């Protein structure tokens, strides 16, 4: 079939006329409220970054504590560290947590752990260790702010601390040097477990809040130009 230039322009004019008279279709809103997705993704990424950062900090700090704390197979019992928030939870219990409780537990845990880490920073004997701890505390404060942002986006209030309950990593005079090191060891170990759990928490939340993919695409092709 021979389509001449005039015929092509005529067909194009006809197509434009048809499109002009089609009922208006609202455009997809690409600039509106993105919802909680970006905040959740940012928080997830931050937990993974902190996991990486903690590996470096823990290696430095455990070497500072010395043997047996820097030995790979050392796994002492929890003694004075019972006040630390526990990340370990039964799998079925973890799955049954609603979004608000999941976020609240993360926020409260890191609020406590941050106070303990600041206590470690004050007690650190070397300038290099104090710098490493201060940098990690700043990153952990950023994670707290990110969790608060997710909660605000979802309409959840921040948990309010009870008066006079702010934790402090400051044992009494009867605490021996070895037991103090045990507490420090368990603080780092519990923090590692919390970051691992938080990555699972926010990955689960991210998948739950992910919007469905668009299923309709308008595709126009022009030929003959």
Swiss-Prot record:
Signal sequence region: 1-27
Main location: secreted
Gene Ontology CC entries for this record: CNTFR-CLCF1 complex; CRLF-CLCF1 complex; extracellular region; extracellular space
Gene3D superfamilies per the UniProt record, alphabetical: 1.20.1250.10
Gene Ontology molecular function, alphabetical: ciliary neurotrophic factor receptor binding; cytokine activity; signaling receptor binding
Keyword check for Secreted: yes
Keyword Membrane applies: no
Protein keywords: Cytokine, Glycoprotein, Secreted, Signal
Function according to Swiss-Prot or TrEMBL: In complex with CRLF1, forms a heterodimeric neurotropic cytokine that plays a crucial role during neuronal development. Also stimulates B-cells. Binds to and activates the ILST/gp130 receptor.
Protein name per the record: Cardiotrophin-like cytokine factor 1
Source organism: Mus musculus (Mouse)
Lineage: Eukaryota, Metazoa, Chordata, Craniata, Vertebrata
């Amino acid at each position: 079939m021979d389509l001449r230039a005039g015929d092509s322009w005529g067909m194009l004019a006809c197509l434009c006329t048809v499109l002009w008279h089609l009922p208006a279709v609202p455009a997809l809103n690409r600039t509106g409220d993105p919802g909680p997705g970006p905040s959740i993704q940012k928080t997830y990424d931050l937990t993974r970054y902190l996991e990486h950062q903690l590996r470096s900090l823990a290696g430095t700090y455990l070497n500072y504590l010395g043997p047996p704390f820097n030995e790979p197979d050392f796994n002492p019992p929890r003694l004075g560290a019972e006040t630390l928030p526990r990340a370990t939870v039964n799998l079925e219990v973890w799955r049954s947590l609603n979004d608000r409780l999941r976020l609240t537990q993360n926020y409260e845990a890191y609020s406590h752990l941050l106070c303990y880490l600041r206590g470690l920073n004050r007690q650190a004997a070397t300038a290099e260790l104090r710098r490493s701890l201060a940098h990690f505390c700043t990153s952990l404060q950023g994670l707290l702010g990110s969790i608060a942002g997710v909660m605000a986006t979802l309409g959840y209030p921040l948990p309010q601390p009870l008066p006079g309950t702010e934790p402090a990593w400051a044992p009494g005079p009867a605490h021996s040097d070895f037991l103090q090191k045990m507490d420090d060891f368990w603080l780092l170990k519990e923090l590692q477990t919390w970051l691992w759990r938080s990555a699972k928490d926010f990955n689960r939340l991210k998948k739950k809040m992910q919007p469905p993919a668009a299923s309709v695409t308008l595709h126009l092709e022009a030929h003959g130009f």
